[in-house]
Amino acid sequence: MAELKNTPLREFHLEMGAKMVPRSGWTLPLHFSEGASDEHHCCRSKAALFDLCADGRYRIAFPGAWQCVQKLLFYGENELQPGQCRRDILMNKEGIAVAPCQVSLMAADDLFVTVPFQCTAKAEALFQSEKAEFVSLSEYLACIGISGPESRKTLVMCGVKEEDLPGEGETKLLELDGLRAIVSFSQFFDEEGFEINFNAECTDQIWDLLLETDLPWPAGLAAQETLALEAGSFGANEFLISRPAADVLAKTALVTFEGRRAPLAGVKLLNEEGKEIAAVTTGAYCPGLERAAAWAYFPEGIPEAGTPLHADASGVTVSGTVGE
């Protein structure tokens, strides 16, 4: 069995009381001493920091690079201008989802692409098969995400001029505490946020700089899951990867349940007639909703909002409704 990899922030996580867990070949923080619920609420009320160093970061730069990558993106028909970025889905020639991604056009035919750590091998295989020549920057660049209503204020307190920060759909090269950084706007959790990519040798410097503002808290994988679930964000979900990208977007919906029990991934959702109409891709209690919720895949199409459903949650039948 291969040895688990660690991010440059491992020791900082341990110092802050993180519970570390194995995930797709990495050891990452599940939650910190405050607990996942408090971390979730901190992201919604102030700001939260996320260790994204395990994610894949790639530069794709050669004549015709944008045209080559366009055909691999679900929203590839929509042009990007230099300095722009967007969330997208990498897919193969058959339209099958390979990985969610964020793609930034740094300059003409010069792209910076990030994918979740769970999907790096599949993304690299796709790039190779389509002759999208790439350079992996994952070992050389660290990435810290910050999300929440005080994200912008945090970076301003770190010395960045507010007018220099990227707006929605933008990526910029900025200086942060004397270091050059690729900073991309991000709204993955339905909160304003930024992904900050910088020299991995200076991870402690940037981590300390952000925490010294006394605004953001560090948050782990558990909070990431519930924040993304509430926001309906498509993540690196094993159930959805390998399905048609169009179906991933058109046939998935949020289902909320009464109480705190949520059905787990793979559990079938039944309608009032007892017919299986969906499968849970991920489920959890969501602190922001104050109830359990699940992201579900409806192979025959999403029923009307408010449609009642029920499912088994660890031996207990739970009732829910389809969200809007």
Task: Give each language-model segment a name.
Residues M1-M16, S104-E324:
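Conserved, structured C-terminal
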Residues M1-M91, I96, L221-A222:
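Acidic, proline/glycine-enriched N-terminal capping motif
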Residues K71-E130:
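Well-ordered mid-protein domain cores that form the structural environment of catalytic cofactors
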